[in-house]
Amino acid sequence: MRYLVFVKQVPDTTLIEVDEQGNLRREGVPSILDPYSEHALELALNLRSEGDSVTVVTMGPPQATAALRRCLEIGADEAYLLSDRAFAGADTYATSRTLTAFVEKFGECPDLILFGKQAADGDTAQVPAEVAEMLGADQFYYVTKAEPSGEGFEVVQDYGDEVRTCRAPKGSVLSVSEGDINRRLPSIERYLQASAMEIKVLDRIALGLGNFSVGNKGSRTKIVRSGSVRSERSCTVVDGSDPAKAATLIRGLF
């Protein structure tokens, strides 16, 4: 089995800044492997058996290799970085087009394609569905568990108020929620192995993409404004022994 996991390096969301065009300003902001991506990687590693492989891929600047290196430390078998100045400013559509191009260049279709359910910096949760649509693949959201079953996979989807068990054919796209997936800690030996592993870099030309189909030029949407939302809450304590005050408060609510 070949498992393909798309991951993302995200800035520390507590230190995020936004430029005048509404794009995230990543320079100087500490970055981490997106926690949702790690859930997807862990599920792929749990599925992997002898003879299987887990490939991780991310689109980003050169420093995104740190997230891929972390994936290799956790247990991934190989890693690819999709990096090109032309990719900058991509919306979810242009990002999905780039990731889809990688799948099409990957050779034989992966048995399963996995994403985190969303990214901590954008929270759109759109890319998995868009990639599935572009590939013509089945897509399953809120997956907490998966295991091989016959010619495909049995996946569990947790919607909060409802849990479903479905049959997913090979080549499906999964959006993975945390569920009961246990995080693993890499050994010292694995750290050393991962530090010596090659991270392959592919640019726009290697993926066969035109300059106007990627990044800001290939985006279908434009960010008008982006920023942090700050909320303040106040609390009013009403003495329950004073019916008049309680009545005044209730009238104020309506």
Which residues fall in each region the model found?
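Short Gly/Thr/Asp-enriched flexible loops that form oxyanion-binding sites at enzyme active sites
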Residues: G122-A137
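N-terminal nucleotide-binding beta1-loop-alpha1 segment
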Residues: M1-V18
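Histidine-anchored nucleotide/phosphate-binding helix
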Residues: S37-R48
